[in-house]
């Protein structure tokens, strides 16, 4: 992101200031930044250099779909990342996923080395026929994979509900609208991480309060 400056920012704000074992860091292998197998490892090494992290706790094949599956196999992603894990430069190997549940089932069947899947998962998309949040989650459970959640608040849409829907949650007196969305995602057994985009300090504090006293 930001022409690579996001990784430099992480280096200055996080990796250069705090002990490495005090935080967890993820990065991703993104199609569009390389075309051949020979370019994958240099791309990864540049990410490590820019962040100064030494290793990534979570390294993901980014935005996996049926369309991109063949490409990632052709460039050796499923060979190179496990080798990086054996070398200790990656701790956990997974992918973010954007496609149908049947595609996910095929990929996890063919690549059991994947440890986790990042899914778009929220109560609005749970039964959505395009996103298939529930079905994709159930595929992960079937294969014994942990799930990290993206879009738990659906780009902020579930943080500011329409008046009628918001009134129902407000009457419960259980916190912000966003907190209900986070708690929905976190309540599933195979979910081990919930990622929420935050643009203000207030949003960050609300999310931290929700997850620190989860109920």
Regions flagged by a language model, labelled:
Residues 6-16, 37-48, 52, 69-79, ...:
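Distinct, well-ordered alpha-helical segments
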Residues 10, 25, 47, 56, ...:
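Conserved, mostly hydrophobic/aromatic
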């Amino acid at each position: 992101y930001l022409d690579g400056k996001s990784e430099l920012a992480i280096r200055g704000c996080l990796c250069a200031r705090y002990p490495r074992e005090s935080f967890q860091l993820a990065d991703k292998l993104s199609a569009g930044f390389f075309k051949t197998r020979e370019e994958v490892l240099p791309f990864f090494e540049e990410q490590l250099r820019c962040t100064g992290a030494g290793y990534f706790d979570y390294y993901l094949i980014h935005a996996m779909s049926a369309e991109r599956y063949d490409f990632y196999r052709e460039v050796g992603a499923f060979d190179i990342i496990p080798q990086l894990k054996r070398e200790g430069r990656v701790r956990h190997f997974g992918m973010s996923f954007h496609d149908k549940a049947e595609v996910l089932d095929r990929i996890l069947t063919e690549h059991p080395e994947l440890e986790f899947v990042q899914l778009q998962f929220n109560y609005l998309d749970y039964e959505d026929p395009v996103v298939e949040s529930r079905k994709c989650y159930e595929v992960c459970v079937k294969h014994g994979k942990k799930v990290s959640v993206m879009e738990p608040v659906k780009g902020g849409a579930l943080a500011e509900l329409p008046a009628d829907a918001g009134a129902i949650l407000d009457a419960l007196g259980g916190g912000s609208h966003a907190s209900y969305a986070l708690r929905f995602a976190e309540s599933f057994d195979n979910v081990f991480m919930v990622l929420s985009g935050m643009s203000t300090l207030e949003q960050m504090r609300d999310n931290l309060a929700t997850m620190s006293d989860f109920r």
